Amino acid sequence: MSARWPAFIAAPLALSVPAAHATVYLSLEQAQQSLFAGASFTPVDFGRRERVWRASQGGWFIVDQVLGKHELITYALGIDPQGRARGIEILEYRESHGGEVRHTSWRAQFSGKGAADPLQLDHDIRNISGATLSCRHITDGVKRLLKLYESELRQR
């Protein structure tokens, strides 16, 4: 038996569903050029979920996703030939709050960090009030990608 919702109930329910909030800040190509200006990129497939490119100038460009509070955050990490972060870029942010992780001053904290650096929120990386989970998960993601470089990419 098929249930029918009267219009006076169905319409308000449909209107009360929150719209997904997604902001695309940079395309893949824009993020690549932001972190490695003038470089060309060669994709590297090594069977993992992260998308990885070797930069013609030396170094690596990796795109990854982490969970914010409820939604995925797509970010990119540039790693120099010595295994240190050149910087991070936020490509797409889907949360309704906490978009401050895109601010240059927050992202700049990662520059120069390597796999041996602690990268702990509230110690090495400043937290943003109202964006704690986004900050924590991006920080953990960057640390994971720096470890990935050490274990998988450095010898390539």
Give residue ranges: language-model regions.
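Bacterial N-terminal signal peptides
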Residues: 7-16
